[in-house]
Structures are given as structure tokens and as C-alpha cells.
UniProtKB/Swiss-Prot annotation:
This protein's name: Sulfate/thiosulfate import ATP-binding protein CysA
Function of the molecule: Part of the ABC transporter complex CysAWTP involved in sulfate/thiosulfate import. Responsible for energy coupling to the transport system.
The keyword Nucleotidyltransferase is assigned to this record: no
One Gene Ontology cellular component: ATP-binding cassette (ABC) transporter complex
Subcellular localization, as worded in the UniProt entry: Cell inner membrane
Principal location: membrane
Keyword Transport: yes
Record EC number: 7.3.2.3
Amino acid sequence: MSIEINNISKYFGRTQVLSDITLNVFSGEMVALLGPSGSGKTTLLRIIAGLEQQTAGKLSFHGQDVSRMHAKDRQVGFVFQHYALFRHMTVFDNVAFGLTVLPRRRRPNMAAIRRKVMELLEMVQLTHFAERYPSQLSGGQKQRVALARALAVEPQILLLDEPFGALDAQVRMELRRWLRQLHEELKFTSVFVTHDQEEAMEVADRVVVMRQGNIEQVGTPQEVWRYPASRFVMEFLGEVNHFSGEIKGSQLLIGGQHLPLNVTPIHQGNVDVFLRPWDIMMNSQPTLSSPLPVQVTEVSPRGHFWQLSVQPLGWHHESVAVVWFDETSVPTRGNRYFIGGTEARLYAGDKQLQTLSLAQTA
């Protein structure tokens, strides 16, 4: 079941929270709505569910206009962040609830309901918890019950509002993998809201990055990560180091140091320079592409790499994050090095300049 969102806007009073949103979600696709608080992602999800009404625009499911259709008629399953389980009902009864309140002509008999519920509990690995109450479950177990309940009525579309936000990091990681596997098995169309970049990157087929009621970028996790469409996306997705610089001719000046470029950019003057921690080069001696002196202040092993924090010596006031991969010569605290990078993203205000490479030789 595909979802077509065409020019949807939403106002709460005089405040606009969605501005002319257009987005297509393909059948069987899992899409993440990713953005900071106030970006409009939950409002958009609730409009798809029928829990909010758009001010303008059209919403269609597989070509059928559902803009005015009641939520109960949309065949949409909704999973909330805080589970919304019935405390007085057992796990079995919570999962069965949606089936028991279907219109009589669509309602299965009790034997069919029991069979369906037990199949779902087996799928979410909670068969032995059927007679327990929500108060007897962990957070991760409650969320799996909520997901089974949403799937019980065989929705065409599954919507999830920060489904793992209330769980600790380890449980979130396990449930993300489990949800991805479940999606690949059942092939339902799904849209989920998150502010967790790692969650969006790991689970989604495509990521929709939102900001202040607008869509900044839509793409696969690899596309939005490698080719950010705006400065906001660049800064929002993952850790990035930010330096103030200036372009003079074919030189990039950072903290009084001259870094030669392989071209002479059209733009001259002040720029903001962005480098990801793993794009930073670090050498014991200064080079053309690594002329900036630093001192190592923190070394944190992370399995197959080391996360370093280095303090610039006289050219930048904030510490710089660096990822180090060479296990044969791991830096120690107090060591002095020189950093730079052959690839940097440069912005003049919000305008992205062409990605520039530092010259390797004079």
C-alpha cells in the first residue's frame, strides 16, 4: 500500500507546523521521518493516521483519496512511544482487542482470534507471556506487545511514533534489528518518527529529514549521509567538526595556516569548514594537507577504532573529534600532532560551495 502526500500544510491556530509537504512512500517501504523537536514529523504521522486533519493538501493511499476518511476506516496500525497498553488486560487480551471490536461482519470467531493472537505472540517471541499483565513486563516486551496489537488487524500501513524512545540503549538496539527483520518478512508499508539518527540509518529504506515544518532532504541512509542537501542536514546527521575559514585565491586559511586547494574557487572570502571525524588526517609532522597543530587530550578505544579528542594549539578554541584506525601506533594523551583533511565541505552562510580537495603537493 503506497502513500501519496501532496502539498499538505497544517496550522494550529496561526502557527504553521507543516508547509506544503509532498512525499511518496512506496508499497512495502519503511521510511523514517527524522528531525529535531518541532520539525513537524509527529504531526505528519498523525495526519497519515487520521488522528489530525491537514489544513490544506491531499493524502492518498494507493491512489485513493483518504483526506476526509475517518481513522478507523484507513486500515492503519499505530504504535505509540509509551505503549498505550490496557493495564487491566492480559497480554493476550491486549493483542486481541482490535479484533474483538471489529464490526460484526468482519469480526473473526473466538477460535480464529485465539489462533491469530498466538501466531502474533510467537512472532514477537512472547508466547509464554500471554497471561501476564503489562505491569509484569519490561519496556521492550511492552513495545513488542504494542506492535503485535497493531499488526493483529492486518493493517495496510504501520505507523510508529518514536517506538523505542522510552527504552534504554541496549534494548533499543535489539528492537531495531528485530523490527527490520519483521518488516523484511511481512513487507508492510511503514512510516516511523524518530530523532535518533542511528535508528533512522539502521532501520529505514529511506530517510526524510525534516526541519521547521519542511522537508530538507529525502534519500537512502547512504545518500543523506554522503551527500547532504543542506547545511542543516550536514550538521544534524552525525558528529562533525566546524571551523571558521577564509578562501584567498587558491588557499584556504584556517587559524592563520594556509592550506593549498587544487582549484581556485569562484567564491572568495569567509567560509564555514566542516570535516567528519573519520575524514581528518593526523600526522606527527606538518604536511601541506595537515598543517594544523593539536595536542591529544582524550583517547577512547571503540573496538576496531579509537575516538580521539584533540585540542588545537593557538588556532581554534574548541576541541576536535578525530577517529583513528591504525592499531600499530595509537596516540596517547599529551602527544602533539598536525591535522587536516583532503576533503572538506564548505559553506558560505547556508549556501554550499563545491566540495574542495586540498592539494597534495605544492
